[in-house]
Structure formats: C-alpha cells, structure tokens
Regions:
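N-terminal, charged low-complexity regulatory/assembly segments
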Residues: 1-189, 194-197
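Extended mid-to-C-terminal alpha-helical interaction segments
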Residues: 205-320
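C-terminal regulatory or interaction extensions
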Residues: 157-246
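Generic serine detector
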Residues: 14, 19, 37, 68, ...
C-alpha cells in the first residue's frame, strides 16, 4: 500500500478545495474508460462519448498520449497538477500546458512502466494534453459546472461537519477505496506498493469530484492532494415506480438519496429541486418516521430510518 507520513499540524491545517481541472480530468478518465458506474454517468456518456471518440480518431497522437498517460497503476504526473484552490479552469490548464516536454515524457514512461512509443518522442505533449482537457471542459463539464459545483460544495460542507463530529480519522476512512487513517501519523492513500512519503510541513488538500474517480498528486515537497468522489452524483438511482406513485416523484427521489446522510444543501444540489420543495419533502418524511435528522457541527444531516429502508426495499421488489 502507498502511505504518507502526516504530522498532526499538517493534518489540522489541511483543507478541502474545488478544482475545475480535477473535475475535468475525472471526466476524461470516465470518457477514456467508457463504463458508467451509475445512471447519471450512463446518461452523460451517451451524450458525450461519440464526440470524444471522434475527436481522438482524428488525432491519433493525442489518443496515444491519453492511453499512455492513464496507466493501470499510475497517472502521468503532468496531467494532474496539484490543485491550489480558487483557480479558474484556464489557470489550471495553463499549468498543464507549461509542463516541460522532457518532464512530460519522463512521466509517461512511469505511467507506462516501460519505454515511450516512438510517436510520443516529441515536444508538444503538454500542449496536446492541455488542448484535450480544454475540449473536455468546454464540451462536457463547463455547461453543467454550476450544478456540479453545488454538489461539490455540499460534499465539502458534509465532510467538514464530519471532521467536527468524529475527527479526521472518520473522514479519511470513508473518503474513497484504498484511503484510510492507519494511526501513528500515517495516511494510506492507495492500495499500490509505493515507498512512503514524508509530507509533514507541506500543504495538504482534499479535492472532491462528481465522477467515481480518485487519485493523488503532489508538487515537489510543497503541496499534496487527494482527489476523491463526492457523495452527491450527477443523477440518483431512479425511484421505483410504485414509490413515486405513493409519495410523489420528488419526495421519492429524496428518500432514495437518503440511503446515506445528506444535508439539505446536498439534496438541493443532487435533485435539482428548490430549497423550499426539499424542505417540505423532509418535513413530511420526518413526520412519517421515514427519515431522521441529527446535527453534525453546524450542519443538519438527514438519513433514512429503518422504516424508510423497508419502504424503499418493498417498492423496489415490486408486488408479491
């Protein structure tokens, strides 16, 4: 497993940040894989995968660059500059474009775990990578960025509340597969066998993205990032027809999402419903004993009760 040595001061000073480039790169990974992990990703791929594949078919060098950079166990570092927070996409993409060609080639050899194909022995790899990321941003992420950002901001609110309630260990253990707090100032960041890194004294940031993706990145020894999938997704699992008929589509959607604790802000972002509508649904579900609420720091989190779980499961199984 790969792990970082993190002292108490570094962990206490860590923060959550949003990154349009990280969101875009997560989208690139999803387009490259072409396999959805939930209905929202399936609909998104149906809209955008044909255009993405057509673009790469017309640019075989960039297509090879993507295949080489997204390694089975490692991503070429120059593709994922460590987020700094509060940077627009254009500034982050400029950092990809500014990578030194020799560094880009070296990073690709690491992600390939072998020699570089002859077609990639060239100096325009950073520009090609930045151009592709700009395409993914413009065509697939930017039009939906405001909604995505609301989901990401809601995730940060919930995670911050969890830190206040249960400490960093509880947050890190649930962040993403392969990440957990090992104790003795050790943070496991993935399941791969890489040498440990001492990061005490560096800046540590945690970066949510809406696709089911995650990775780590760093800049020298000054800044480290853990990118993880946000709890909100682009679209929830559709409610069973019977549940929608019983509760109404909007209320059923809220109940489905509350399989895990969520704040009102997260529900608004994930459902696209207004704050007033979500609030009314929650009041009815609370009165009916289908959901419960508890305070986590400054936030109030809602989740299904056992009765709510029974109702959802019964509706999903259908008659009989």
């Amino acid at each position: 497993m790969g792990w970082w040595q993190v002292n108490a001061d570094t962990l206490a000073g860590s923060r959550f940040v949003l990154s349009p480039l990280a969101e875009t790169f997560a989208g690139l990974k999803l387009l490259h894989a072409g396999v959805p992990s939930h209905p929202g990703e399936r609909a998104w791929l149906r809209r955008h995968l044909p255009g993405y594949r057509a673009r790469l078919a017309a640019d075989p060098v960039t297509a090879l660059l993507v295949r080489s950079g997204l390694g089975r166990e490692w991503i070429a570092d120059f593709l994922t500059p460590t987020p700094r927070g509060d940077e627009p996409f254009e500034a982050e993409a400029a950092r990809v474009r500014a990578a030194r060609p020799e560094d880009a080639r070296a990073h690709l050899r690491v992600s390939l775990a072998g020699p570089l194909p002859d077609a990639l022995e060239r100096d325009d790899l950073p520009a090609r990578a930045a151009g592709l990321l700009e395409y993914v941003w413009t065509e697939t992420v930017s039009p939906d960025w405001e909604r995505r950002r609301r989901i990401l901001e809601a995730d940060v609110v919930a995670r911050t509340a969890q830190v206040s309630r249960g400490g960093w260990a509880a947050v890190l253990d649930a962040l993403r597969p392969g990440t957990r707090w090992l104790g003795e100032n050790r943070l496991q960041v993935n399941a791969h066998e890489y040498p440990p890194r001492e990061i005490s004294g560096a800046e540590l940031v945690f970066v949510p993205v809406t696709p089911r993706a995650g990775w780590v990145s760093w800049e020298e020894r000054e800044r480290y990032a853990v990118v993880y999938p946000a709890t909100g997704v682009l679209a929830p699992e559709p409610a069973p027809a019977g549940l929608g008929a019983l509760l109404g589509a909007g209320r059923a959607r809220v109940l489905i999402l509350l399989a895990s604790p969520m704040s009102t802000t997260q529900l608004v972002a994930s459902t696209g419903q207004g704050l007033g509508s979500v609030g009314r649904h929650l009041r009815v579900l609370l009165d009916a004993g289908m959901v419960e609420r508890r305070r986590a720091g400054r936030s109030v989190l809602y989740s299904r009760t056992a009765a709510g779980d029974v109702l959802v499961k019964a509706a999903a199984s259908g008659p009989g």
